[in-house]
């Protein structure tokens, strides 16, 4: 049986990590000066006067690489706690993690065969 008080540190961490960005946005919105002008609407080019239009269309390849990266980054986030408590969880958790990794590998092979990882 799970004891809920063991998860108090998790909920405290979740609450604090959610509150910090919200507070940062609220404080910056209240304390920052509001100045309107053409400089605010122009793109920033490291202090150099911008040349041409700043609106560029990115190739869809960037999107595909980013999507594959996010999938495997999330996989790492899920597997790290499992790896830290592997000795406690036992064989059933190993089988579940193996199935999880197998599904992700199948997704990678599918993306590879469809040409999602090809640059040209």
UniProtKB/Swiss-Prot annotation:
Q: How does it sit in the membrane?
A: Multi-pass membrane protein
Q: Where are the transmembrane segments?
A: 9-29, 64-84, 88-108
A Gene Ontology molecular function term of the record:
quinone binding
What does UniProt give as GO cellular component? chloroplast; chloroplast thylakoid membrane
Which range is the signal sequence, renumbered to this chain? none
Q: What is its main location?
A: plastid
Q: Which GO terms describe its biological process?
A: photosynthesis; photosynthesis, light reaction
Catalysis performed (reactions):
a plastoquinone + NADH + (n+1) H(+)(in) = a plastoquinol + NAD(+) + n H(+)(out); a plastoquinone + NADPH + (n+1) H(+)(in) = a plastoquinol + NADP(+) + n H(+)(out)
Q: What is its EC number?
A: 7.1.1.-
Task: Give, as one word, the top-level EC class.
Answer: translocase
| The entry's keywords | Chloroplast, Membrane, NAD, NADP, Plastid, Plastoquinone, Quinone, Thylakoid, Translocase, Transmembrane, Transmembrane helix, Transport
Q: Where found, per UniProt?
A: Plastid, Chloroplast thylakoid membrane
Q: Pfam families, alphabetically?
A: Oxidored_q4 (PF00507)
Q: Which family does it belong to?
A: Belongs to the complex I subunit 3 family.
| Function according to Swiss-Prot or TrEMBL | NDH shuttles electrons from NAD(P)H:plastoquinone, via FMN and iron-sulfur (Fe-S) centers, to quinones in the photosynthetic chain and possibly in a chloroplast respiratory chain. The immediate electron acceptor for the enzyme in this species is believed to be plastoquinone. Couples the redox reaction to proton translocation, and thus conserves the redox energy in a proton gradient.
Q: What do we know about how this protein assembles, alone or with others?
A: NDH is composed of at least 16 different subunits, 5 of which are encoded in the nucleus.
Q: What is this protein called?
A: NAD(P)H-quinone oxidoreductase subunit 3, chloroplastic
Q: Which organism is it from?
A: Arabidopsis thaliana (Mouse-ear cress)
